[in-house]
Amino acid sequence: MNRFIIPNQPQYGVPSPTPTRSPESFITDAETYFNQGKLIPAINSYKDAITSNPNDPAVYVALAQVQVFQGQYKEAQKSAESAILLNNDSSMAHAVLGWALSFQGDYLEAETNIKQALLLDDRNALAHAYYVEILVGYSYTPTAPFGAIEKAIEESRVAVDLAPDKLETYRARGIILEATGQYDEAIDQYKKAIDINGNIPDLHLALGINYRVRGFYDLAIAEFTSANALNPNDPNPDLYLSRTYATIGEFAQSMQYAESAVANNPADTNLRGNLGVMYYRNAYWEKSTKELGYVINGGFTEDGTPLNAINLLPDAPRIAEYYFTYGLALSRLNKCGEALGIVRMINERIPTDELAVENATAIVNRCQQNLVQTPIPPFPTSPNPAAATTPTATP
């Protein structure tokens, strides 16, 4: 009797098995997306790779790096911690964890992890580059270790020796040069990093900041615009565009970008303060006092967003600007009781701030004028910026 082997036939109604993609294919996609500046798709592809193979610490590290560039610092921390759980001896995992923690202000723990990374591999160029960023950020805090900037300079040179042509090395050199006031040299380093990958928003933001400090406002605006296009949900490019347009006297555009910044992060009181300043410069007195009132008093927005007040302290010129602009706007509305309260606060808390005291005097003068004349009510629907008393401000 003849026998035939009949191949398995698919059963009706039962789906055919779908070929499973390899984790390597997802990693390739992620790297391609990253090089194109598509950070969110890159993140999603790395996550797909992890779903396909959850036991590769290197993929968690790569994911964490992109998450930092995207500004997802808490998520980057979790990814790096997952890598460490899989391999506690991974120098890169500890390095990226330290890097992610520094962006959250936890510099002590960040430095602990970066030191562990270098203990595991003292020739890890990226760890040295990340250490530069950590130390520079740390140096701006009251608890900064002695010699943080000097150590950052040393670490940046080690990174250059180990990997002179890496994006992270150019970025680290740019950061330390900027921190030491060498803006032209910092610009050169950031441009070299952008030549390697022009699709990382933070690099354009950093380059724009240095152009702005040097007074190259058109170039700064171009870089901030690039950063904004690459990461439209980040309020920082909008904030810097707002301040830069205000510096060159284009107050209508400065107001628009200030509004965009607040839309991106409605709970940031500092952004509310900036918006209040720009409303003032466009002669929207009522709107100005509303936004600046959040800075001085805190409270809740109409949609219930909580906002914390920002105290007026010495050596904080931006905060001082919020306070004296609030006082100026109140005086414009003939609310001189509140306005003079701001004057007293300025004179008591920051008496050596010449700019703030000068504007406090302007508030008093405006209120004295209000006593002897009937103020003409402003027309916020048709502002005349030229008629406003524009406070002098640090750009």
Predicted regions and their residues:
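Long, contiguous interaction/recruitment modules in multidomain scaffold/adaptor proteins
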Residues: 1-21, 112-136, 141, 155-164
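Alpha-helical segment of the N-proximal tetratricopeptide repeat
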Residues: 19-58, 62-72, 103, 137-145, ...
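Helix-start (N-cap) detector for alpha-helical repeat units in TPR-like alpha-solenoids
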Residues: 23, 57-58, 91-95, 125-126, ...
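Structural signature of tandem alpha-helical TPR/SEL1-like repeats
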Residues: 37-44, 70-82, 104-116, 139-158, ...
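Structural marker of alpha-solenoid helical repeat scaffolds
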Residues: 52, 86, 120, 162, ...
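Terminal, low-structured helical/coil segments at or just beyond the last alpha-helical repeat
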Residues: 304-395
